[in-house]
């Protein structure tokens, strides 16, 4: 068994092409499969980018190399130094003939999970053995697309002049006055894991940053057990000064559109591997009001009254009607947090919006209240004590500009982009009501 020593990978599997005939390469990865047929062995090496075939003919390699090849096991870690040989009959038009094989580490057998995807496994088993599960090419494809999604979003924000910020995740009280918080011991006090950076984003508007964003974890102690909820999630949050809710929606459209375009350009292999029906959306999305959404739901037999939040049945009804990406706007004020700005002509309706994909909510936002007196009134009307929000409210006394923003669920958006029906597929180590390990 060898150390890497002076060897360094020269190529990933997908970088080797037939035109490199005669060139020496060093490959490193896992043994995806091994077939020993008398005086010939076939080793499929798998790395981050794909698989590559090494052919080990006894008459063309030294005895030690051939014996090492024959004794390889699935998922052993190996390094191969060899020559590329063009061969039209080979799977990719070439094969690699090893000069030397180094076994860097052995894998125990039997494997608790088959990374080759030949043996199916339930999602709980896969999540228990996630380190093996993410070796599967299709699982890696999900996370490569997710990575490109986040890279694209950061680039769009940078191009638009946003400042990236990091807000506290240990907080003294609830952001929105709810009780769905995880309490923790904080020295002699009680604290909570943050459920949203909302109040801090708004305070940054008072600080004069104009446009900020954050990509970070949020925590919600909701006792859901569904395919679309987690208790720890990644949220993409933004806030902008001197804008209204329509400007915030336009920015969200730009972020989402750019994600689709960047993924199509930079991750075509992953799109193909996942067999995605990929289509870049229009630059502006369809929009309907909450009232119109309620009318659609009622017309499809859903029992719901104006002023209620949309039930799952209502979301399904509207999603079936709309399809794709669309906004629901002009929500009842009573369904939204205290910092949401009511319409000036009808305070029963507020300047809030949700971005939906079919029946799935992926983003929520609004124009915010920027007047101190109205904010205090809203907090009181919702049965909360303004004194509990003293440090937040202070930012509104000394020059708070009009502002708007939104939060986009990274995990849910990744679900949409990769066409997964369970949010856990898009999170490396998900945290839900039952799962706290690995």
Curated annotation (Swiss-Prot):
It is found in: Cytoplasm. The record marks 91 as: Important for tRNA non-discrimination. Its EC number is 6.1.1.23. Signal peptide: none annotated. It catalyses: tRNA(Asx) + L-aspartate + ATP = L-aspartyl-tRNA(Asx) + AMP + diphosphate. It comes from the Archaea. ATP binds at residues 220-222, 228-230, 361, 409-412. Residues 198-201 are annotated as: Aspartate. Mg(2+) 3 binds at residue 361. L-aspartate binds at residues 176, 220, 364, 368. Keywords: Aminoacyl-tRNA synthetase, ATP-binding, Cytoplasm, Ligase, Magnesium, Metal-binding, Nucleotide-binding, Protein biosynthesis. Pfam families: tRNA-synt_2, tRNA_anti-codon. Its cofactor is Mg(2+). Binds 3 Mg(2+) cations per subunit. The strongest magnesium site (Mg1) is bound to the beta- and gamma-phosphates of ATP and four water molecules complete its coordination sphere. One of its GO terms (biological process) is aspartyl-tRNA aminoacylation. HAMAP family: Asp_tRNA_synth_type2. Belongs to the class-II aminoacyl-tRNA synthetase family. Type 2 subfamily. Homodimer. Aspartyl-tRNA synthetase with relaxed tRNA specificity since it is able to aspartylate not only its cognate tRNA(Asp) but also tRNA(Asn). Reaction proceeds in two steps: L-aspartate is first activated by ATP to form Asp-AMP and then transferred to the acceptor end of tRNA(Asp/Asn). This is Aspartate--tRNA(Asp/Asn) ligase. It comes from Methanococcus maripaludis (strain C7 / ATCC BAA-1331).
């Amino acid at each position: 068994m060898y150390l890497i020593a002076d060897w360094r990978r020269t190529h990933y599997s997908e970088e080797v092409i037939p035109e490199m005939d005669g060139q020496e390469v060093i490959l490193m990865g896992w043994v995806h499969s091994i077939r020993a047929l008398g005086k010939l062995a076939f080793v499929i090496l798998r790395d981050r980018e794909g698989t590559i075939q090494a052919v080990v003919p006894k008459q063309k390699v030294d005895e030690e190399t051939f014996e090492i090849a024959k004794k390889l096991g699935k998922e052993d870690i190996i390094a191969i130094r060899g020559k590329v040989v063009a061969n039209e009959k080979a799977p990719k038009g070439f094969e690699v003939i090893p000069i030397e094989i180094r076994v860097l580490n052995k894998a125990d057998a039997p494997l608790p999970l088959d990374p080759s995807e030949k043996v199916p496994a339930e999602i709980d088993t896969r999540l228990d053995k996630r380190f093996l599960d993410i070796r599967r090419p299709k699982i890696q494809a999900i996370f490569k697309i997710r990575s490109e999604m986040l890279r694209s979003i950061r680039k769009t924000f940078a191009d638009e002049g946003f400042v990236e910020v990091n807000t506290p995740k240990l907080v003294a009280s609830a952001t929105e006055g709810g009780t769905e918080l995880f309490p923790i011991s904080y020295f002699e006090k009680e604290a909570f894991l943050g459920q949203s950076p909302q109040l801090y984003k708004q305070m940054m508007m008072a600080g004069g940053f104009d446009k900020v964003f954050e990509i970070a974890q949020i925590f919600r102690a909701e006792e859901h057990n569904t395919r679309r909820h987690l208790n720890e999630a990644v949220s993409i949050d933004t806030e902008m000064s001197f804008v209204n809710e329509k400007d915030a929606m336009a920015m969200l459209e730009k972020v989402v559109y750019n994600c689709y375009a960047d993924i199509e350009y930079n991750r075509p292999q992953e799109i193909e591997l996942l067999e995605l029906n990929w289509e870049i959306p229009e630059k502006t999305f369809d929009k309907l009001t909450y009232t119109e959404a309620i009318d659609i739901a009622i017309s499809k037999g859903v029992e719901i009254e104006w002023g209620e939040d949309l039930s799952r049945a209502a979301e399904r009804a509207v999603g079936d009607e709309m399809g794709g990406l669309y906004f629901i706007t002009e929500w009842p004020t009573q369904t939204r947090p205290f910092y949401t700005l009511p319409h000036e002509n009808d305070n029963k309706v507020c300047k809030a919006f949700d971005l939906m994909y079919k029946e799935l909510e992926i983003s929520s936002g609004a124009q915010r209240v920027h007047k101190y007196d109205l904010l205090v009134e809203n907090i009181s009307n919702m049965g909360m004590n303004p004194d509990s929000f003293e440090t937040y409210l202070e930012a509104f006394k000394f020059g708070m500009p009009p502002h708007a923003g939104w939060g986009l669920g990274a995990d849910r958006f990744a679900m949409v982009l990769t066409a997964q029906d369970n949010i856990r597929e898009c999170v490396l180590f998900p945290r839900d009501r039952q799962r706290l390990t690995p």
